[in-house]
Amino acid sequence: MTPEQILDIAPKVLTQTQRESYFNEGYLLLERVIDDHWLTRLRAATDELVERSRAITVSDVIFDLEPNHSAHKPRLRRVSNPVEHHAAYWDYCLHSVMPDIVSDLVGPNLKFHHSKLNFKWANGGEEVKWHYDISFWPHTNYSPLTIGTYLYDCGMEQGPLGVLPKSHLIDPMLSQYDADGHWTGCLSAADCARLDLAKAVFLPGPAGSLTIHNCRTLHYSARNDSDLGRPLLLNTLTSADAMPYTVNPIKPKHDQFMVRGERARFAHHDPRPCLIPPDWSKGYSSIFALQQEEEVQAVAR
């Protein structure tokens, strides 16, 4: 569906002004939307996963660990596919207000793509450099969005999500390959220098707040040097008529599950081109490993 078609449908949760702002600016921040019932469940589930990580010494398909992670002092960067590792996360995707909010932005027919739980651990949780999401998992259109849920209060000291307003309108999109054709998962220093990053907007918020950014919106988060962690639950959802061009790198079992509405009979193709990532059909590490150059070499094109 096009933005115009979506805006013609009466919203379930958002105001029309909020919807128009999302399409114009590429992001939204909604404060204190998720109630204590869901926060309590999600926090308990997250605590259980952190406890499980104590037995892990090397990053695997579930746990992406910081280099100094230990059983005594866990330090996680990410849990991949949390919806597959605790029922609370999947229940949240299906039964909370969150998917109704997303349907106000992508249309009534809504598909799940993937989820992740990013931690930004206290006293050194790593920076995430400026990047687009859609280049990791290109689709036939640009309806996909990522909606983040702050499980605890997040101030500027914890490295909240930062977005560049209207960057979803930049055409053509900037590359996430380097000059030698290797995938880096982020913009080059030269491209960053050409952007007016002084216009970046950061999205701190109290527990239960939602960050929403379009798949073309450039975003970033700073290192967390505070004494408080910043767990952020991220879910990526798409309109039913957005079809993936490539394999889902995280390979979730719920990929393409209809969260709301009905399956599309026709794909919607945006005329703008979309960068294609490397072939991840045999596996994928994480954006953290790529951007921190932990691989022997970035994935070749």
Across the structure, where does each feature detected by a protein language model lie?
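Non-heme Fe(II)/2-oxoglutarate
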Residues: P3-D8, R52, V58, D64, ...
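Generic beta-strand structural signal
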Residues: P108-S115, E126-V128, S143-T149, G159, ...
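Short, surface-exposed loop/helix-turn segments at secondary-structure junctions
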Residues: V61-F63, Y132, G181, G185-L197, ...
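A short beta-loop-beta micro-motif enriched in histidine and acidic residues
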Residues: Y132-P144, A198-K199, G205, L228-G229
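Feature marks short, surface-exposed loop/turn motifs that line or immediately flank catalytic pockets
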Residues: W38, W121, G155, I170, ...
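Non-heme Fe(II)-dependent double-stranded beta-helix
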Residues: M1-E25, E31-W130, S135-P138, Q176, ...
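Short, conserved beta-strand element in jelly-roll/cupin
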Residues: P138-M156, P204-G205, I212, T236-S239
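Double-stranded beta-helix
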Residues: I6, E20, C154-A222
